[in-house]
């Protein structure tokens, strides 16, 4: 029995600076709203190197010691499994700037959930900030998120 499946690997990181976190106002036509920096993992790179690269490309910041917190995943209509590896980081260097992905800004962490969030970001925020939660599986057919 062949158990192989098509998988898309991506990553996302919540960056903290004291009581603030960095948000990205995503402007991609298919995924808009407030999110965290991140993107696709290239075929030859490690997960950690991917999040460091993506954060740098989208923000100008080089994060250090990112910590993997969990996964947000779902099965697309064509059967492809989509995995988002979730990280947090509080050590970084560099000068903050926006990119083609959208505008970036620091906000109070307590203000995150009142932002115009992109789909799934409430669950992402919970996974990153709750040590008792490590995965959210989204079922497209029912539009239901199962957080564990």
Where are these regions (language model features)?
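Short connector loops at helix/strand junctions that flank enzyme active sites
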Residues: 8, 16, 36, 63, ...
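A short coil-to-beta-strand element that immediately follows conserved catalytic motifs
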Residues: 62-70
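Conserved N-terminal beta-strand and adjoining loop/helix that marks the start
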Residues: 1-21
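Conserved Nudix-box catalytic region and its N-terminal flanking loop in Nudix hydrolases
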Residues: 20-56, 143, 148
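Acidic/histidine-enriched, glycine/proline-rich intrinsically disordered or flexible terminal extensions
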Residues: 130-148
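NUDIX/MutT-family hydrolases
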Residues: 88, 97-129, 146-148
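Active-site-adjacent beta-strand/loop module that shapes the phosphate/pyrophosphate-binding cleft
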Residues: 74-95, 124-127
